[in-house]
């Protein structure tokens, strides 16, 4: 569904192309949605749209690995739907999102997938893909995972270790899900928090009379995230399959990931904009509405060092790509938990501000180079989820998803100017220098001069093939480790009587 003026053809002049391995000054020509030429002094053909990018950077469109648009969750539905959510995305320089299909316990994965895809196809303003959560385990689930991988373009499945009595799976179920992921060449993803302990912690807080939003963090401290992260990695490594920890929110969890990586375990970690941009002390704010707006799981940590340390991990490459977990609820929805924090719908914004928050806290602090920024916000996600270099790179033949980034232009983030449906912004008042001035999706300008010009439903579903680069070398690692598992040859057991009688 394209507008007539959407030709997918554009010439960008005089910009600095930044990929994750190098940057250079060049013009870029996109034709019919695909990058056609990258060279200096491309002459514009007659009638072609030309944009000047002098003193600006040309970045591969951002990839948000983790959104929940119009998610039915905790008795309500997140307010950023696939239309508003992808509008907010492109306004911030993100041109590709991966959302999560979350079937209910007992529901067919295929049925849920079809439902999510319909919701998205009708509304998306940029390309997208779907992860699928596995919330129960059976032969049927196993068969449907295969269909999703082989016929529906899914190469990632998420397990929840939290949300007891709804999405949470047991360790044994997780073991079987991971084994199936390995057979199918799909990456296993995990929401890592010890759900049983969270459940007990919640009861304890309520018994103590702590009913406000601070009870959310107090009932699910860092240690429960670190413990579950460790457990997920150990289980995945026991079946020798790559595992991706979504929304790494604490120093303890990041340390665990780093320790296992040092030992050669194939684990990936995803920090999110919230954890890199703010701290969780807001949950102690005296204004209930303000405090509740920061409630998400795992909690944004109150330890003020956290965001800087997570950024250090990202810069070192010990955390991989930045998502958002964008899952927004307005004040009246959050108020479902006004007397009991366990009923506050979990989730915050991020999809619009992710790129600027990472630039501000990463590039402007001297922690990330331009190339590392591109890696963290786009290329690495494309590699892990096996759509690179179609996405995540500016090169001939790649999709024409390009952001014209002004590293010197500033803005102050606010709910009054953001493009979300939600009535709160967790980054309110933060000044960022480094913003997307123009966003191009498939060769069409969708954001420029502070104005959106998207076409609802014009985004495409991008299938992701299995056995991506995260599986490279996995077979050999498994083989070598299995060779160490040796049976000991022994004579058959004889009890003492048999032994004596044979003497
Ligand atoms: O609080 C969160 N994270 N809400 C969305 C669901 C999830 O756990 O990712
Ligand atoms: Zn989660
Ligand atoms: Zn999530």
UniProtKB/Swiss-Prot annotation:
GO terms for biological process: pyrimidine nucleobase catabolic process. It catalyses: 5,6-dihydrouracil + H2O = 3-(carbamoylamino)propanoate + H(+). Binds 2 Zn(2+) ions per subunit. Its cofactor is Zn(2+). Zn(2+) 2 binds at residues 158, 191, 247. Pfam families: Amidohydro_1. Keywords: Hydrolase, Metal-binding, Zinc. It is an enzyme of class 3 (hydrolase). The keyword Metal-binding applies. It comes from the Eukaryota. GO terms for molecular function: dihydropyrimidinase activity; zinc ion binding. Its EC number is 3.5.2.2. Zn(2+) 1 binds at residues 66, 68, 158, 325. Substrate binds at residues 163, 346. One of its GO terms (cellular component) is cytosol. Carboxylation allows a single lysine to coordinate two zinc ions. The modification N6-carboxylysine is found at residue 158. Homotetramer. NCBIfam families: D-hydantoinase. PANTHER family: COLLAPSIN RESPONSE MEDIATOR PROTEIN (PTHR11647:SF1), HYDRANTOINASE/DIHYDROPYRIMIDINASE FAMILY MEMBER (PTHR11647). Belongs to the metallo-dependent hydrolases superfamily. Hydantoinase/dihydropyrimidinase family. Catalyzes the second step of the reductive pyrimidine degradation, the reversible hydrolytic ring opening of dihydropyrimidines. Can catalyze the ring opening of 5,6-dihydrouracil to N-carbamyl-alanine and of 5,6-dihydrothymine to N-carbamyl-amino isobutyrate. This is Dihydropyrimidinase. It comes from Dictyostelium discoideum (Social amoeba). The gene is pyd2.
């Amino acid at each position: 569904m394209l507008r007539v003026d959407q030709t997918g053809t554009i010439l960008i002049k005089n910009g600095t192309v930044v990929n994750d391995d190098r940057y250079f000054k060049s013009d870029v020509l996109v034709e019919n949605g695909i990058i056609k030429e990258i060279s200096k002094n491309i002459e514009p053909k007659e009638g072609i749209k030309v944009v000047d990018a002098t003193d600006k950077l040309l970045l591969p469109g951002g990839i948000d690995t983790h959104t929940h648009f119009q998610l039915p969750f905790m008795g309500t539905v997140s307010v950023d739907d696939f239309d508003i959510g992808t509008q907010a995305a492109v306004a911030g320089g993100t041109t590709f999102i991966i959302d999560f299909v979350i079937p209910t316990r007992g529901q067919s994965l295929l049925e849920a997938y079809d439902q999510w895809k319909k919701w998205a196809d009708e509304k998306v303003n940029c390309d997208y893909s779907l992860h699928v959560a596995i919330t129960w385990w059976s032969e049927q689930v196993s068969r449907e995972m295969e269909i999703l991988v082989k016929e529906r373009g899914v190469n990632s499945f998420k397990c929840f270790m939290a949300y007891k009595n709804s999405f949470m799976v047991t360790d044994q179920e997780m073991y079987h899900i991971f084994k199936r992921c390995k057979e199918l060449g799909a990456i296993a993803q995990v929401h890592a928090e010890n759900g049983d302990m969270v459940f007990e912690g919640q009861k304890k807080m309520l018994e103590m009379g702590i009913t406000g939003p601070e009870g959310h963090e107090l009932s699910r401290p860092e240690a429960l995230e670190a413990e579950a992260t460790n457990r997920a990695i150990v289980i995945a490594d026991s079946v020798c399959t790559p595992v991706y920890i979504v929304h790494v929110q604490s120093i303890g969890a990041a340390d665990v990931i780093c320790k296992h990586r040092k030992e050669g375990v194939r684990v990936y970690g995803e920090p999110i904009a919230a954890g890199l941009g703010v701290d969780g002390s807001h949950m102690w704010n005296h204004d209930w509405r303000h405090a509740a707006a920061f409630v998400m799981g795992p909690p944004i940590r109150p330890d003020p060092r956290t965001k800087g340390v997570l950024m250090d991990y990202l810069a070192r490459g010990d955390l991989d790509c930045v998502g958002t977990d964008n899952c927004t609820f307005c004040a009246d929805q959050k108020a479902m938990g006004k007397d009991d924090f366990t009923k506050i719908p979990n989730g915050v914004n991020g999809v619009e501000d992710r790129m600027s928050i990472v630039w501000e806290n990463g590039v402007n602090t001297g922690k990330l180079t331009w190339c590392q920024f591109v890696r963290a916000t786009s290329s690495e996600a494309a590699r892990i989820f096996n759509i690179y270099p179609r996405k995540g790179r500016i090169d001939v033949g790649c999709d024409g998803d390009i952001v014209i980034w002004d590293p010197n232009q500033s803005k102050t983030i606010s709910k009054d100017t953001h493009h979300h449906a939600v009535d709160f912004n967790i980054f309110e008042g933060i000044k960022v220098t480094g913003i997307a001035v123009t966003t191009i999706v498939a060769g069409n300008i969708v954001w420029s001069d502070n104005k959106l010009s998207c076409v609802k439903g014009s985004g495409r579903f991008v299938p992701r093939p299995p056995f991506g680069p995260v599986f490279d070398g996995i077979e050999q690692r498994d083989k070598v480790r299995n060779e160490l598992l040796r049976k000991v040859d022994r004579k058959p057991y004889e009890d003492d009587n048999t032994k004596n009688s044979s003497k």
